[in-house]
């Protein structure tokens, strides 16, 4: 059981030892410019069967009701309004419609 609690220790005395138990990275303080992957001790590569199951799950997701509903919806085209040609009332109306549903971030001093 002591190995489980070692994960919560503040200082790992074996951190800089030659036989460190850190997994999945090069552990240098230099930036290599590439993506570094950190894996847990229990990490395993997915098998080809798992990958095939993932493709099957993707097909099922695409055929779900929510995906079919979203594909039926049309994307509305945004209109571009020239602010310099708007009256003050029109500008205020557009401004308020853009802020609809936004939280009130007013601060009282």
From Swiss-Prot:
Parts forming coiled coils? none
Region Disordered: what ranges?
37-81
Output compositional bias ranges, type Basic and acidic residues: 41-64
User: From what superkingdom does this record's organism come?
Assistant: Eukaryota
- InterPro entries, per the entry: Spg4 (IPR020485)
Q: Which family does it belong to?
A: Belongs to the SPG4 family.
Role this protein plays:
Stationary phase-essential protein not required for growth on nonfermentable carbon sources.
This protein's name: Stationary phase protein 4
Q: What is the lineage of its organism?
A: Eukaryota, Fungi, Dikarya, Ascomycota, Saccharomycotina
**Gene, per the UniProt record:** SPG4
